[in-house]
Regions:
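Canonical P-loop GTPase G-domain recognition
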Residues: 13-25, 157-211
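Conserved alpha-helical scaffold flanking the Walker A/P-loop in AAA+ ATPase domains
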Residues: 71-77, 104-112
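Glycine- and Gly-Pro-enriched alpha-helical subdomains that act as flexible
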Residues: 98-101, 124-125
Length: 211
């Protein structure tokens, strides 16, 4: 698992571009660059996170309405890797057939992408992890996939509430103290530095993420 102690470097994003949207694996980019996937429930802030770390306010389309990401979206960063925004899970207002289609897209990507280097799981810091969050974490653990956990919307909590809530999320997820949970805010930039450090470490040494 990632450890932010000791020597570290921070990734500098100098180029970021949207490349394509896909449903099936044959539509994924063919340049064999590594993927870092973003997973989380609908409206957890995946698109906002992309815009924050790339310093591009409109690179990924954001919406206050859950369920707007309906395809697998590929963003190429520094011509070195892709951030891949997957459809959000757990949005009840979407018809069952549409949810099943999203589920198929997510499962296809996660199970059949040899370029998948790691996963960023986003969880709303204001709430306990959902059953869908737990299911996703179990999948990630089963496949021993390198993981970064972001606790989003940290600006919605007072500073004194952030650490207790992160500790509560850690207990609910049953992850070790060696797995950092990064409080993150797209509004204030909190956690951006640590996320860029984590991404840099993951890309340079993915096996070093394995606990």
């Amino acid at each position: 698992m990632l450890c932010l102690r000791g020597e570290w470097t921070r990734m500098k994003v100098v180029k970021a571009e949207f490349i394509t949207s896909a449903v099936e694996s044959h539509q994924y980019p063919a340049d064999h660059l590594p993927y870092v996937a973003l997973v989380g429930k609908s409206n957890v802030g995946k698109s906002s996170m992309i815009n924050t770390v790339t310093n591009r306010s409109k690179l990924a389309k954001t919406s206050g309405q859950p369920g707007k990401t309906r395809l697998v979206n590929f963003y190429r960063i520094n011509d070195a890797f892709y951030l891949v925004d997957l459809p959000g899970y757990g949005f009840a207002r979407v018809p069952q057939k549409e949810r099943e289609r999203w589920g198929h897209m997510i499962e296809t990507f996660l199970s059949s992408s040899p370029n998948l280097l790691g996963i960023i799981q986003l969880i709303d810091i204001r709430h306990n992890p959902t059953e869908d969050d737990m299911t996703m974490l179990n999948w990630i653990s089963h496949y021993e996939m390198p993981l970064i956990i972001l606790a989003t919307k940290a600006d919605k909590l007072g500073k004194t509430r952030i650490k207790p809530q992160v500790d509560k999320i850690r207990r609910k997820l049953a992850v070790s103290m060696d797995m950092p949970i990064i409080p993150f805010s797209s509004q204030t930039g909190q956690g951006k530095e640590n996320l860029l450090i984590a991404l840099d470490s993951l890309l340079k040494n993915p096996l070093g993420f394995q606990g």
